[in-house]
Amino acid sequence: MSLEQHYSSILTQLGEDVNREGLLDTPKRAAKAMKYLCRGYQQSLEEVVNGALFSSDNSEMVLVKDIELYSLCEHHLLPFIGKAHVAYIPNGKVLGLSKVARIVDMYARRLQIQENMSRQIAEAVQQVTGALGVAVVIQAQHMCMMMRGVEKQNSSMVTSVMLGEFRDNAATRSEFLSLIR
């Protein structure tokens, strides 16, 4: 059974008439949208980075902040929307600027929980760059908590992962946290 057929079945199970005008192409559109929203499964870290790793003598923090992200909660298939802040301390190599955002997107475009996604992003940046430290903070609003369940409209979730120098050195961690405020 195709994804489109599954969506048609879901609509029918909800009591909808899949032959009414407004729903005629909905299963097809929904299947296409879900494939797009989950395209991270079709990507690899090597493909996303695409060789954009450059030699550098820089040993100071590199920070890309306010990277917008859109993901789907793996528990309810509802969106969570937020921003990621990703920093690393280079160890002879720097990553092409857009590649940090592409790494975030690769992991966000999967069925996820924010806690795991934060760690996956940090470990990916560490793996690719060999950085002395990596820090990731993500703040997001979860529709599964806003639209259903407790229905808390102003809540957000913050997760952080600190590796290497960011975990071991309070001054480095504090500098990062002050820069993302």
From Swiss-Prot:
The protein's Enzyme Commission number: 3.5.4.16
Gene Ontology terms describing biological process: one-carbon metabolic process; tetrahydrobiopterin biosynthetic process; tetrahydrofolate biosynthetic process
Keyword GTP-binding in annotation: yes
Keyword line: GTP-binding, Hydrolase, Nucleotide-binding, One-carbon metabolism
Entry GO CC: cytoplasm
Molecular functions per Gene Ontology: GTP binding; GTP cyclohydrolase I activity; zinc ion binding
Enzyme class: hydrolase
Similarity comment: family membership: Belongs to the GTP cyclohydrolase I family.
Name of the molecule in the record: GTP cyclohydrolase 1 2
Pathway in which this enzyme or protein is active: Cofactor biosynthesis; 7,8-dihydroneopterin triphosphate biosynthesis; 7,8-dihydroneopterin triphosphate from GTP: step 1/1
